[in-house]
Amino acid sequence: MAERYFIISGLLFVILFIAIFVYHFIKVNSFYNRVKDFCFANNFKFKKNPNKNVKFQITGFTKKYHWIFQNFIVKPNYISGDEIESYFQFSVPGVKINNMFIIGKAEMANSPGIEELDEKVVSMFLKNVLGEKVAEKLNDIIVIEFGRTDAFKFQYLTLSHKKANPLLIIDEELENLMANGFDWVADNDFSLVILPDRLIIKTNATNEISDIKTVIELGTKIIMRI
């Protein structure tokens, strides 16, 4: 009787294991199939696991720039016990622009004055985004405010080191996309910056095609304005 019980229990365990494996396999492949369909519909190129740190990669061409969308995966640290991190990164190598930087969203707080924002924003931008080598090359930084109306949820800050004629590439269409298209992103998981030779958008990864589309759409719209 006991032997029969163990056999049945073992079979149930095997069946459960197979069911979980099949469910995961179907779920993962269903996601990749939807990504492939999205790429095919937009003439993008899809590649799964281009290297050990990238789950999948999408490439496309807009105007004169080739862009790359990647789902990076950071392997866990077995010593510290840190969990696996997964994030999206949209990048455009070779963007030739030296006077434009964009920093992510800051929540509206009773329309704060420029003086209140300047020190905090510039300090965070230099420390977390540009790095010392790039920051050294900036002679002068000013903050130009956008979205000071109730039409948008967030305020975007554009930083430039050319006071006379800063290049403005954020308009209402872009700002609306940035404000309403990234509700799924936590504030500290979203960064967008144009460096002297590269545009980068980085945010947390999801399994929603609409989120992938939003990141690519934002990046390509910015490229079209450069």
Regions found by a protein language model. Give the residues of each.
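Core hydrophobic alpha-helical transmembrane segments of single-pass membrane proteins
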Residues: 12-18
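Charged, low-complexity intrinsically disordered regions
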Residues: 36, 45-55, 80-85, 89-226
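Feature marks short, highly hydrophobic, charge-poor N-terminal signal-anchor/signal peptide-like helices
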Residues: 1-11
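Short strand-coil-strand connectors
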Residues: 40, 61-65, 95
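Transmembrane-cytosolic junction motif
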Residues: 18-42
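Generic alpha-helix initiation/capping and coil-helix boundary signal
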Residues: 2-3, 32, 212
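Acidic, Ser/Thr-rich low-complexity segments on the non-lumenal side of membrane proteins
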Residues: 47-79
